[in-house]
Amino acid sequence: MPRLKDKYQNDVIPAMMEKFGYKNKMQVPKLEKIVINIGLGEALQNPKAVDAAVADLMAITGQRPVLTKAKKSVAGFRVRQGATIGVKVTLRGDRMYEFMDKFVNIVLPRVRDFRGLSPKSFDGRGNYSVGLREQLIFPEIDYDKIDKVRGMEVTFVTTAKTDEEARELLQLMGMPFSR
């Protein structure tokens, strides 16, 4: 069993029940999935960028990413309907807990001048998103093998109804929020 899942069941659930007064442990919010997305604007000019991004995400998550395609054509961005404009991975279950553990304990400390995550990035429905500027902060990415520095969005989807509950959940699971 992943370390973080164990921590959730033994430490987080009792703490959340006490703080929010849940009567049943099934009411306690939990992490549902983690979605990692890389938007590829440059894929329109350089089709090889997609393969590189797929390789990066596969190394980071250990799972094959899905190509995201444009829903509509946008002349201003020179985007055709159906053109590949990004790659994403959805992690659930044990892989999700393993990724979050690695994200909190290895990846975030490697971010340059990191002062904690902004507590303002909740969406109002109990989900938290964080943007990363480069993929180099992941230990699986080899500096010599990358063609271009790419950013990505990491979204933590929880079953929490409010941002306050979601923040408490993520904080108890080790997310370093700034004050």
Swiss-Prot record:
Q: Which GO terms describe its cellular component?
A: ribonucleoprotein complex; ribosome
Q: Does the keyword tRNA-binding apply?
A: yes
One GO term (biological process)? translation
Q: Which residues form the signal peptide?
A: none
Q: Return one GO MF term.
A: tRNA binding
Pfam families according to UniProt: Ribosomal_L5, Ribosomal_L5_C
InterPro entries from the UniProt entry = Ribosomal_uL5, Ribosomal_uL5_bac-type, Ribosomal_uL5_C, Ribosomal_uL5_CS, Ribosomal_uL5_dom_sf, Ribosomal_uL5_N
Q: Which UniProt keywords apply?
A: Ribonucleoprotein, Ribosomal protein, RNA-binding, rRNA-binding, tRNA-binding
Q: Please name the SUPFAM superfamilies in this protein's record.
A: RL5-like (SSF55282)
Subunit composition and interactions: Part of the 50S ribosomal subunit; part of the 5S rRNA/L5/L18/L25 subcomplex. Contacts the 5S rRNA and the P site tRNA. Forms a bridge to the 30S subunit in the 70S ribosome.
Family in the record: Belongs to the universal ribosomal protein uL5 family.
Function, as annotated, reads: This is one of the proteins that bind and probably mediate the attachment of the 5S RNA into the large ribosomal subunit, where it forms part of the central protuberance. In the 70S ribosome it contacts protein S13 of the 30S subunit (bridge B1b), connecting the 2 subunits; this bridge is implicated in subunit movement. Contacts the P site tRNA; the 5S rRNA and some of its associated proteins might help stabilize positioning of ribosome-bound tRNAs.
NCBIfam families the record matches: PRK00010.1
Q: What is the name attached to this protein's record?
A: Large ribosomal subunit protein uL5
